[in-house]
Amino acid sequence: MNANIFSAPIFKKPTGTHLLILLTGLLFLLVVFFQSTNSLLIPLMATTLISAGLGCQVVPMLRRLKMGQIMREDGPQAHLKKAGTPTMGGSFFVPVALIFALIWSKFTPNVVAVALLTFVYMGIGWLDDWQILRYKSNKGLSPQMKLILQITGAVLFCLWMLVNQVSTDITLWGRLVIPLGFFFWILAGFVLVAESNATNLTDGVDGLAGGTGAIAFLGLGIIIAPSHPDLAIFCTCFAGACLGFIFHNRNPAKVFMGDTGSLALGGALAAVGLIAGHLWGLFLISGLFFLESLSVIAQVIYYKATKGPDGKGKRLLKMAPFHHHLELSGWTETKIVGAFYLVNALLVVLAIWSS
């Protein structure tokens, strides 16, 4: 192969459309190679088309309602030009995923429970987005209030799992099963809150959270399909809805998902992983989300640890989360997103092979 092919613009500076094609191809290949019956292909395609089509109606409406994003002044300066881009895009693609997942799965108890948890987390995100738009600031709900609401949702979901006698065993690499007993509930609450915050932190570059979310959902769906076909349908509908959203969110984005979408993504992923007993697969698939979270935690700890008499500390990264560090290191947004898509697809393949 001619090495000069990699000097082509599609590799050096991909466009948002290039990334949409890449994402579509990755999702299609995952279904074809790892899902023997291809039963997930139809719900994937259907929700993609419906989500993309609905967005054509909702995005202009959000613009007319002046639902423009308020940008962080302490964020990358290049992002200030995005101020005014409609937000709360999660309000159209998340309901598409939930409605079609419920119908396609025939309202099984597991899917109903996960859908309700997802709706609750979407509601928390909506409140946060609405506060930001209402007061024209980027503060939204206080971190304490948001955490309290997330924990409340997690506790209610754990109570449902307890009543319905969901297994407290977790399966690790090599099909090693570990019974956690009471400690499972502590882990479950943590996973629900941590995963939703991790996807929220990942939502900082056009097409990043939605695309990596689509790959993660489809990968988790493929893993659990043999044991939980109803939840596999849920995951596939979410993957398709995310892909349809990327049609509008690809660089340059016409709409952002906001916390309305990002909190729902993480909550849904965590809930499915917990019910299906595949936390190891969830951990691998969510590797990039956790990297984003850990980069923020490490940045804060390092800054406080190196704080001098003047009250100022040193920064481990140029900016957290990690994708902002890459931006300030000279990476274009599209290059970051393309790299994250490919790495996430590899993590999904690893999770499938090890499950």
From Swiss-Prot:
EC annotation from Swiss-Prot or TrEMBL: 2.7.8.13
Any one GO molecular-function label of the UniProt entry: UDP-N-acetylmuramoyl-L-alanyl-D-glutamyl-meso-2,6-diaminopimelyl-D-alanyl-D-alanine:undecaprenyl-phosphate transferase activity
Pathway membership, UniProt: Cell wall biogenesis; peptidoglycan biosynthesis
Keyword line: Cell cycle, Cell division, Cell inner membrane, Cell membrane, Cell shape, Cell wall biogenesis/degradation, Magnesium, Membrane, Metal-binding, Peptidoglycan synthesis, Transferase, Transmembrane, Transmembrane helix
Protein's membrane topology: Multi-pass membrane protein
Pfam families: Glycos_transf_4, MraY_sig1
CDD domains hit by this protein: GT_MraY
Keyword Transmembrane helix part of the UniProt annotation: yes
Reactions that this protein is recorded to catalyse: UDP-N-acetyl-alpha-D-muramoyl-L-alanyl-gamma-D-glutamyl-meso-2,6-diaminopimeloyl-D-alanyl-D-alanine + di-trans,octa-cis-undecaprenyl phosphate = di-trans,octa-cis-undecaprenyl diphospho-N-acetyl-alpha-D-muramoyl-L-alanyl-D-glutamyl-meso-2,6-diaminopimeloyl-D-alanyl-D-alanine + UMP
GO CC annotation terms, alphabetical: plasma membrane
Keyword Glycoprotein part of the UniProt annotation: no
GO biological process terms on file: cell division; cell wall organization; peptidoglycan biosynthetic process; regulation of cell shape
Cofactor: Mg(2+)
Signal peptide residues on this chain, from the entry's feature table: none
InterPro entries linked: Glycosyl_transferase_4 (IPR000715), PNAcMuramoyl-5peptid_Trfase (IPR003524), PNAcMuramoyl-5peptid_Trfase_CS (IPR018480)
Cellular location(s): Cell inner membrane
Transmembrane segments annotated in the record for this chain: 14-34, 40-60, 84-104, 107-127, 147-167, 176-196, 205-225, 227-247, 268-290, 334-354
PANTHER family, per the entry: PHOSPHO-N-ACETYLMURAMOYL-PENTAPEPTIDE-TRANSFERASE (PTHR22926), PHOSPHO-N-ACETYLMURAMOYL-PENTAPEPTIDE-TRANSFERASE HOMOLOG (PTHR22926:SF5)
Family membership: Belongs to the glycosyltransferase 4 family. MraY subfamily.
HAMAP family reported for this sequence: MraY
Protein known as: Phospho-N-acetylmuramoyl-pentapeptide-transferase
Species whose genome carries this gene: Microcystis aeruginosa (strain NIES-843 / IAM M-2473)
Gene of this entry: mraY
